[in-house]
A protein has these predicted regions:
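Redox cofactor-anchoring modules in respiratory/redox and cofactor-processing assemblies
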Residues: 1-192
Length: 192
């Protein structure tokens, strides 16, 4: 549905306003700003927080439930999260590998093709997502993809700094956040 709310409402309040998670299931992830924001897990462990947040919150807090975050642009910026016109809520039974592949293919299709980084980058991202979803990558290949110096990070950095428009800067987010926050889900797709 469509809901217009004031800044400052919590994620939990918005989801409750919209009727909750279908079937009363448990929250797995949220895509703030749709696929542009990637997938944020329901619970963010301290190690996943931006450094500026780690300095602000007391040391005894080890995790944050994203349902308790206030939906305000400045607050989301502190958390390095995007806050756009919509969110997608995923229950525990959602297959985020499948969802990421759908997002990557969407960006590949939506790329106008004018700039090389986006045209080639979005195609490469969709290819990697397809290889992942089809179980053609080994566990070590998947682990290499997820590193801070791996090919996905390098591609994302190149796209962000050289793409003509915003599409090229956000296209890697679904795959990057999937690899970062949901490694157990990704490993299920690894080739033996």
């Amino acid at each position: 549905g469509v809901y217009e709310v004031e800044n400052g409402i919590t994620v939990r309040e918005l989801i409750e306003l919209a009727g909750g998670i279908r079937g009363g299931e448990t929250l797995k992830a949220i895509a703030f700003s749709g696929p542009s924001g990637g997938f944020t897990p329901a619970i963010l462990p301290r190690g996943a927080w931006p450094r500026k947040i780690q300095r602000l919150l007391p040391a005894n807090i080890e995790q944050v439930n994203i349902l308790d975050l206030q939906m305000h642009i400045n607050y989301f910026r502190l958390w390095d999260l995007m806050l756009g016109a919509g969110i997608v809520v995923y229950a525990q039974d959602a297959d985020l590998v499948d969802q990421a592949l759908a997002c990557l293919r969407f960006y590949q299709t939506e790329s106008c093709g004018k700039c090389v980084p986006c045209r080639i980058g979005s195609t490469k991202l969709a290819e990697i997502g397809g290889e992942l979803a089809e179980g053609r990558l080994t566990r070590s290949e998947l682990e290499e993809l997820a590193t801070e110096t791996g090919p996905i990070t390098e591609l994302a950095s190149t796209m962000a700094s050289t793409a003509i428009c915003g599409l090229g800067t956000v296209a890697p987010n679904p795959l990057m956040t999937l690899l970062r926050f949901f490694p157990e889900e990704v490993r299920r797709y690894a080739r033996p």
